[in-house]
Amino acid sequence: EPVQGEAGVRELPAGYLEAARELTRTAGALLIVDEVQTGMGRSGAWMAHHLLAPGVVPDVVTLAKGLGGGIPIGAVVATGEAASLLGPGQHGTTFGGNPVACAAALAVIDTIRGQDLLGRVERLGSAWARELLAVDGVDEVRGRGLLIGVGLAAGLPPAGEIAATLAEHGFIVNAPRPDTIRLAPPFILSDDDASAFTTTLSEVLARALSEKAGS
């Protein structure tokens, strides 16, 4: 993954993908990039590796989640020699190429292009990250576009408890790590909704910090 979602929204170190490309080329192995969480515009580009390592061309890219816009679909995209490793009929799947899922994927691609959602995700993600970083109790904001990891300060309740409190206020987030809240909202998230979340997060963390100080 160019940005590791379950690890707390952490980017690969600079140069990592370039080194992986060189190692796999030397060994005659495939470089497979997992863009299931980060692909299809989530990072503000079609694929997160386009941002982190623009010169790297993977042999295989895996896609799902955002590709279908809510309709279940997964895809394996192969380039170059890797694309010829499987011939027709060598890999079967009962629902492979499902017409409804494929139509949904095409509609997603058309919508992202037609509504400039890549630009929208990049602009909103950058502005929102700055807002979140200014919240008392937030130590760090990581990620790209609208895949954001909010690193909580030491001494706060576990991120899972904070996420549960936010859910009570109408915001669905999750906590992949004990100190991290992960945000992955729809690309059509409004500026007002983003600001409303920031305000609520600030209130929730302020209450938690106050309770800690009084204990």
Give the ranges of each region predicted by the language model.
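Conserved N-terminal phosphate-binding loop of PLP-dependent enzymes in the Aspartate aminotransferase
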Residues: 1-215
